[in-house]
């Protein structure tokens, strides 16, 4: 049985299928956390929000209901037929510093209770740990993962192989490479919740990109990511699965999730949402409710908005408009924008993943300059045949060999109807950002330098002049009246 299949791609995001013993999971998706002792919302109820699978803590089950779990199985105690992923107690290890169980015991326990996706007892090294500590923890984690692989030989359960390494890029990349050698079914990126809590999205993006560099195809799970404002960026960077108890934890503090951030119920006069909760109640009604009822409804909203964002992301992947969606979402917070801009340092990775042909290019701001389509265009035009004298113009109403467009730069006349430059929607040159004009001007000068034997006569409107003052010697600059 093929356990993993990629159906659609855009940027580094994908729509995939993962086959488990209890059915198929289509990604990207979220696995809501279910507390086996006190289920805030029951596992089966999660289906109405869009859940295809859930995650629970096998260590808690082992400590509090071991015999019942061995008798009924994890699906029996959660009363669901959905796929169930079980964590191993690593969270407790991170919070309390110790757990009273060995790796082999918890892996075997997860297998015996019928977990669909098993997680070994990895060591979640926190951000900013010194290199020696992170490396030592990683060695132990890798040994435990190898042990788990041996223990699960011949089993139908899927194995998750967590990738650790703290905030050290080389360790994360090394860990991902070693995890790939071990051979898991899913690769969770661990110990990143402190980065998300502190809004350290630049560091988060680097961690994801380093892991994706060593795992170019495999399914990646971003452990503990449960805020909808992060999903689009994380998917575009290469993540497929998310899990979180955020829907419940935020609700307990009267915090209301949106794709642009978190709102306090006390500050809301209107709900910016039309989910069943928000359609049938207003903020004042919720504030007057008993705490338990209010928490439940806010948690339901938090789940609805989270799964709605997943559907929005999937549709964007289908339409090849994921870049446009991400460029909107990252403006929710300056630190998210800084995180997204880390893709500039991983050009080759992004170019390999992103589809070469799409229906259109919609410019949303200067971050559109970083898309692979722009870089590919600038490379491609260097191979276009040019006459001895090349006429370049910013006026599309007159004849020219090459037209100069913001963002893309030189566009040969024969490419005016082709993707990307010919299918691009870009603001007029007098209102577009200066960076878009500068990038286009640099692309033109790069083309001129690559053809020193050709003569370029360049006719541009005034807005371009300051960016083209230093044309190469084979260029003649003229201003259009």
UniProtKB/Swiss-Prot annotation:
Could you cite one Gene Ontology molecular function of this protein? zinc ion binding
Question: Active site located where?
Answer: 87
Q: What reaction does this catalyse?
A: guanosine(15) in tRNA + 7-cyano-7-deazaguanine = 7-cyano-7-carbaguanosine(15) in tRNA + guanine
Superkingdom is Archaea
Its GO biological process terms? tRNA wobble guanine modification
One short Pfam family name for this protein?
Answer: TGT
**Residues reported in the UniProt entry to bind substrate:** 122, 191
Q: Which cofactor does it need?
A: Zn(2+)
**Keyword annotations of the record:** Glycosyltransferase, Metal-binding, Transferase, tRNA processing, Zinc
> Cross-referenced InterPro entries, in alphabetical order?
ArchSynthase1/Queuine_TRR, TGT-like_sf, TgtA, tRNA_ribo_trans-like
Which GO cellular component term is one of those annotated?
Answer: cytoplasm
Q: Which NCBIfam families match?
A: arcsn_tRNA_tgt (TIGR00432), tgt_general (TIGR00449)
- What does the UniProt record say this protein does? Exchanges the guanine residue with 7-cyano-7-deazaguanine (preQ0) at position 15 in the dihydrouridine loop (D-loop) of archaeal tRNAs.
Q: What is this protein called?
A: tRNA-guanine(15) transglycosylase
């Amino acid at each position: 049985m093929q356990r993993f299949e990629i159906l659609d791609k855009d940027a580094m995001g994908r729509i995939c299928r993962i086959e488990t013993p209890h059915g198929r999971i289509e990604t990207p998706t979220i696995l809501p956390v279910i507390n086996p002792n006190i289920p805030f919302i029951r596992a089966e109820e999660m289906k109405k929000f869009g859940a295809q699978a859930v995650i629970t803590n096998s260590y808690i089950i082992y400590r509090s209901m071991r015999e019942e779990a061995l008798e009924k199985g994890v699906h029996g105690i959660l009363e669901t037929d959905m796929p169930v992923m079980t964590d191993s107690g690593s969270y407790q290890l991170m919070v309390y510093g110790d757990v009273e169980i060995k790796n082999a015991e918890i892996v075997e326990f997860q297998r015996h209770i019928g977990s669909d996706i098993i997680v070994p007892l990895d060591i979640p090294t926190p951000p900013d740990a010194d290199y020696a500590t992170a490396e030592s923890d990683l060695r132990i984690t890798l040994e435990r993962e190898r042990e788990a692989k041996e223990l699960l030989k011949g089993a139908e359960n899927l194995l998750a192989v967590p990738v650790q390494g703290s905030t050290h890029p080389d360790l994360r990349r090394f860990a991902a490479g070693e995890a790939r050698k071990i051979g898991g079914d899913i690769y969770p990126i661990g110990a990143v919740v402190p980065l998300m809590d502190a809004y350290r999205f630049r560091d988060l993006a680097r961690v994801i990109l380093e892991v994706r560099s060593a795992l170019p195809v495999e399914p990646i799970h971003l452990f503990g990511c449960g805020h909808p404002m992060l999903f689009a960026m994380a998917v575009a960077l290469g993540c497929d699965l998310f899990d979180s108890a955020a829907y419940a934890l935020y609700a307990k503090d009267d915090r209301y999730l949106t794709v642009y951030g978190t709102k306090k119920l006390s500050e809301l006069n209107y709900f910016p949402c039309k989910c069943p909760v928000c359609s049938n109640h207003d903020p004042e009604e919720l504030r007057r409710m008993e705490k338990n009822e209010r928490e439940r409804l806010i948690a339901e909203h938090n789940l609805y908005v989270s799964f709605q964002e997943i559907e929005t992301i999937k549709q964007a992947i289908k339409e090849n408009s994921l870049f446009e969606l991400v460029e909107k979402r990252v403006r929710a917070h300056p630190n998210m924008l800084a995180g997204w801009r880390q893709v500039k340092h991983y050009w080759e990775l992004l170019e390999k993943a992103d589809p070469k042909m799409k229906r259109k290019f919609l410019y949303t701001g200067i971050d559109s300059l970083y898309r692979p389509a722009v870089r590919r265009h600038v490379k491609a035009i260097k191979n276009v045949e040019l006459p001895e004298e090349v006429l370049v113009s910013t006026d599309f109403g007159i004849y020219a060999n090459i037209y100069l467009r913001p963002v893309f730069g030189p566009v040969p006349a024969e490419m005016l109807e082709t993707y990307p430059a010919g299918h691009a929607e870009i603001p007029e040159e007098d209102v577009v950002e200066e960076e878009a004009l500068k990038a286009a001007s640099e692309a033109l000068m790069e083309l001129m330098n690559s053809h020193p034997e050709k003569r370029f006569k360049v006719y541009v409107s005034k807005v371009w002049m300051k960016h083209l003052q230093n044309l190469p010697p084979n260029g003649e600059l003229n201003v259009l009246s």
